[in-house]
Each structure stands twice: as C-alpha cells, then as structure tokens.
Amino acid sequence: MKGGDKMKKLILLMLLLPISLIGCTDEESSVTVGHTTVYYTNVPDAKAEVLAGYLQEEFGFTSDTDILLSMSGNEYEVRIPSSYSSPSEVEESFKVYFALLASRVSEEVFFGSPVKLVLVTHQNDELFAVKNQYSFEKAGRVFVYFKGVDREQAFNLANYLESLVGENYDWDVIFEQSEGVYHVVPFVGINDASELTPEMENSYQSMATELEDVLGGDVVVHLVNFEGYEVAAFEG
C-alpha cells in the first residue's frame, strides 16, 4: 500500500543546489545552524535560528547555503536558493513539495503565522512563490495537511495512517471536506492507475472503508502522484 518515500527524497538532491545568494549583506543579522545560514531583517533572533535548524534538517545541506528571511506585516517571507535559472525549469513535483513545505514551516517554525516561500536563483531572482494553504498535523512521520476539518479529525487520520505504515515511514496526505464528504489525498509513488496491483487496490479500498468509521462520515481516498495529479479514487 505504501507509495514510496516522501516526495522530497526523490527531488531534493537533483533540484536544490547549496549556494551563496547574491544580495546577502553585512547589514543584515545572520545565524548559522550546520551548513544553513539565515540572513534576516525585522525578525526575532530566535525565529531565525529555529528556521535555520528546521531547513538544515529538512534539506540536509552539506555545503554552505544562504537563506533570506524577512517579515512584512504579519507574513514571513523565506527565500530559498536553487540551481534553476528560469521558472520554466522548475518541475511540478517541486512546486507541490514547496506548497506543502510552506504549511509545515508556518506551523512548526512560526506558530501558524502566514508564510511565503520563494524559490530563487543564486542571484536572488524569484522563480516562483507559494503561501501556506493548510493547517498541519502529524503522527510519527505521517504528515496531514488539512483545511475545512477540525484538528482533532486530522489527528485521528494521522494516527490511523501511522498505524498502517509505522512510525518511521514518511507520508504526505492532504485532508479536506466538501459537501459532507471527507477527501483523503495521499501522495503515492506511481504515475497512473495501470501501476496499481490488485493488492494495492484492495488495500486502498479497505482504507476508504475503515476511514468512514475513524472519521464518522463518507470518505473518498484520492491517490495523487508527486506532481499532484490524481491516479485513482476509492469510495468508502
């Protein structure tokens, strides 16, 4: 049933290049954790240090990498360098990953404050940007991104999924409700329905059925690939 490791493990080494950003100045404050240095303005020192540690752990940088952090109003902006030189080079899977990361950074670093993640070239030119869209809950290494449902339901979902895959398996799952139906959207490591084996189909169908008891309502499980496209759906 498991679709593979979390999407970041497939793309980070290919798509992120540890690099020094043009635009970092001595006038900014800075903090370094591991190989990650955050240059920041108008942000508390403690927040910058937590962000540096979080991104170092998330990306596992092995060479010195510069991150820019600033704040406008109540929104934090985080500029992250990449090896890309134009927006057309950025793969859809990376955009999906970044959208989820924005929600995690919002909750795990900035306590739910609005966050804008900006992917940039080494010259600090913007490639694309995304804001946090979801609240976030987790159990083990199962990450549930939710909106339109309460946190308790998201926690119940995370715990159920963690009981299936174990505490060390990384899994990203979107959780929403529409017209009285719970939509559970796990990311899986397949590209289309032809790659589903009968055993996988049975497992996901069982999941949809069991989740109706866990969540107390109608459930549809939508499998999506790492680019965010639906592969298959199973009704409870």
Swiss-Prot record:
<protein>
    <recommendedName>
        <fullName>Uncharacterized protein AF_1994</fullName>
    </recommendedName>
</protein>
<feature type="signal peptide">
    <location>
        <begin position="1"/>
        <end position="29"/>
    </location>
</feature>
<keyword id="KW-0732">Signal</keyword>
